[in-house]
Amino acid sequence: MEPIGFDRTEGAPLSGEDIESLLRNLTRPVLGQRDEALDDFRISIAGAQEKTALLRVDGQWMRPLGATPTTHIFKLPLGLVANLRFDLSDSVENEWLCSRLLAALGLPVAQTDMARFGDQRVLVVERFDRRRVSEGRWIARLPQEDFCQATGMPAERKYERDGGPGMNDILRILAAGSHPMEDGLVFALSQFAF
């Protein structure tokens, strides 16, 4: 059965104030209140950082409707972490700068921009797992697999110190890909950069 609406782009336009409210409510939910306009809008993006995702069409931010996927991830500052011992309030600026440094080294990075919606500061990241198809009429999701999935490891073992995949495992998988030399070089350069 073919999904309904996959072959078109549909979204509800959002103003800057709408986005500010959406971002504010990510970190400060009010008991008993909800934004009914967003009730059908649910996303799941891994990671510890507060984030959401939206659709951008011809310069207009939108809430995707139906089968239309998001195109950009909005990441809020981390703030105080580790029982208030570390202040990562500048995480938006830090991640933006790191992406510029990695790009300068020749590594492929997602397009990032810093943006402000009212008093909400965010890093806007263009999703690398999306492609416009059919002359831009709709957006295709590109399935992704991380190295835990590729090696059959459970998510709780995502770090090498916990028994997750290490450099040798990753290089072995990359060697079996369609661009083994290029992928291996990018991986090695990224290890050097970090």
Descriptions of predicted regions:
Residues 1-194:
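Phosphate/dinucleotide-binding and metal-coordinating scaffold of catalytic cores
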